[in-house]
Amino acid sequence: MIFGGIKSMEKIYFIGINGIGMSGLAKIMKCKGYDVKGADICTNYVTEELLSMGIVVYNEHDEENVKGADYVIASTAIKESNPELSYAKNNGIEILKRGELLAKLLNRETGIAVAGTHGKTTTSSMLSAVMLSKDPTIVVGGILPEIKSNAKPGKSEYFIAEADESDNSFLFMNPKYAVITNIDADHLDVHGNLDNIKKSFIKFICHTQKEAIICLDCENLKEVVTRLPEEKTVTTYSIKDESANIFAKNIKIEDRKTIFELYINKELIGEFSLNIPGEHNIQNSLPVIYLAFKFGVSKEEIQEALNKFKGSKRRYDVLFDKELENGYGNKTKRVRIVDDYAHHPTEIKATLKAIKSIDTSRLVAIFQPHRYSRVHFLLDEFKDAFVNVDKVILLPIYAAGEKNEFNISSEELKEHINHNNVEVMNEWKDIKRYVSRVKKDSTYIFMGAGDISTLAHEIAEELEGMSE
């Protein structure tokens, strides 16, 4: 039985080991003394760290790789036809879902699980950064600059992790504390409708052993709170509703910093500031500060950590920010390239609003829609997602393994976006050419959960060459 004592270097095999969630667990299990191997057909920035830790990573799926494994870990994205998964089933190897393994780790500790349709990576990363002095175990869905990784084993009782609602795997968890940032319509191909998503979150909150910290700025969560059993301990937070237990007011922006006063149960705790823009990030910071105080982190430590926190990789990730000659009378232009994971309409709108609040330059959103099913189900919600930009460029939809059963395209999405300057560009070379010809100060934000980050990095590298 896993965690029943390591016997002769028990062997764990991860199918899809380079994924952001799978790789974090692989690192933790390696540090716990397990013999860890895995396979993934996609090589990325995570692979090098896994190899440096002595983890064997195969670049193809083959049943020979799995032979001798005591356990196989697979995410729900792995198809039943996968040869490694088939071999494990046919040979009696214990198979765990990624979410099951994460829950087994977290449930044994003072687990703090961060859930929500949007903001869970930023919130869990921010909490991890603020709690570093307490030496927590960390498993988050992005690369946290403070630890240069998405995972870190800790020696204390604290375990900070994201809770994934997309496939209901967060229902394996029984955390001591839970943070719920919001609920929105997403992954409808799995859940069917919004009410089913709410029911899943209610179950998750009921699994929480001590305290659930819930955002009242989300109307869906407000309703969920009314449907919870009376015996559940709930603490609320808000930047709009002063009845919340944790409340931020007197919000202002100075020198690209967001400053606010924090009140807990009507008592002024003090003034705090963030170096990442947007009201949604103030919301994200409120449960972080509250929990850090609860676990004994000083106000000075909290503020210092918040000042240093720049977000995790692919969350408002500035890749390039320099002045370049524009070729017209040797005048200079300031060009900023930003990489961001936002792919749901709500995330896109919040991110672009936040950038517009601190950036006066021309703003261009270059968006790669993610999954045919998501575009189909959320088509109407994309209508006002881009109201804060000067131009929208759409790439073809990133399939993420889906078949186009809905016969939908970026051209159709273009017709639903409420903006008079939307263009579809099918080739990366066209986008590179467009960015290189800019004549005025501009910020280009590359958005999506597919491979658009690679394009953003390529353009940033080319601009670096132009600036030398």
UniProtKB/Swiss-Prot annotation:
Keywords: ATP-binding, Cell cycle, Cell division, Cell shape, Cell wall biogenesis/degradation, Cytoplasm, Ligase, Nucleotide-binding, Peptidoglycan synthesis. Pathway: Cell wall biogenesis; peptidoglycan biosynthesis. GO terms for biological process: cell division; cell wall organization; peptidoglycan biosynthetic process; regulation of cell shape. Its main location: cytoplasm. GO terms for cellular component: cytoplasm. SUPFAM superfamilies: MurCD N-terminal domain, MurD-like peptide ligases, catalytic domain, MurD-like peptide ligases, peptide-binding domain. InterPro entries: Mur-like_cat_sf, Mur_ligase_C, Mur_ligase_C_dom_sf, Mur_ligase_cen, Mur_ligase_N, MurCDEF_pg_biosynth, UDP-N-AcMur_Ala_ligase_MurC. Its EC number is 6.3.2.8. The keyword Cell division applies. ATP binds at residues 116-122. It catalyses: UDP-N-acetyl-alpha-D-muramate + L-alanine + ATP = UDP-N-acetyl-alpha-D-muramoyl-L-alanine + ADP + phosphate + H(+). It is an enzyme of class 6 (ligase). It is found in: Cytoplasm. It holds the Pfam family Mur_ligase. GO terms for molecular function: ATP binding; UDP-N-acetylmuramate-L-alanine ligase activity. Cell wall formation. PANTHER family: UDP-N-ACETYLMURAMATE--L-ALANINE LIGASE, UDP-N-ACETYLMURAMATE--L-ALANINE LIGASE-RELATED. Belongs to the MurCDEF family. This is UDP-N-acetylmuramate--L-alanine ligase. It comes from Fusobacterium nucleatum subsp. nucleatum (strain ATCC 25586 / DSM 15643 / BCRC 10681 / CIP 101130 / JCM 8532 / KCTC 2640 / LMG 13131 / VPI 4355).
